[in-house]
Amino acid sequence: MILHAIVRGRVQGVGFRYWVLEQARAQGLKGWVRNCHDGTVEVEAEGTEDELFEFEQNLWRGPVLSRVDQVLASRHDTPRDFQGFQITR
């Protein structure tokens, strides 16, 4: 299962991508996270339904300096060939 999410709020310049990286790796998820030009952060993660539910809930928390206003999330079954979890540009 794949989770695709766009996170809105104060999520750039506050360590959000590195925090997502740590959360994803701690859960054993594969995928990526990146900053977008519009000030959002985009995430794509692969895992079980339960893992992705927990991960999505964690996205609402974010690191201490962040403020998450919205998480736009969708799920799909299209297989990916992710190699671990990484920050992309």
Where on the chain are the PLM-derived regions?
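Intrinsically disordered, low-complexity, mixed-charge
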Residues: 1-89
